[in-house]
Amino acid sequence: MRLVSDPRYGEVDLSASAEELTCLASAVAQGEGLLSSASSSGSNTLAGVEVKNTSGPGVLVHRDAERQILVISGDSASRTVLAENLRAMATAEDGGHLHIDYYPGHFYLAEGSLPLVVNSPHGGMPTR
C-alpha cells in the first residue's frame, strides 16, 4: 500500500494491491486496525492508515500530521458503506479510481473529511 498526501489538491492518494484494499475494507468494517504503507523518501508519503470506531455521525477521514498517518473514524453504518466501496474497488476487474469526497449533505462522510482517491489495483481507466 502507498499513501501520498497531496498538499496542492488537499487530498490523499491511495494505491494498493487487491489484497491490501480488502484488508483495509475489513479494518474499516470492523472499526479498528493499523495498516502500514510502503516506506518512501518523499515528505508527503504517509506511514499508514489507522481505523477507529467512533460515534460519528459519519466517517471522518483526516491526516494525523504528527504521526504521518491517515485516520479513518466513524460510526458502524457509515464505515460499512465506505468498506463496501473499498471492497468494490479491490474486486473490480478493470482499472480506474474512486474519489471519496465530502460535500454538504453527504450520506456517509463527515464534514471536514479529506478527499481520498483510491486507485484500482488494475491501473488506469476502465476498459469498458
Regions found by a protein language model. Name each.
Residues 1-128:
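Positively charged, low-complexity terminal tracts
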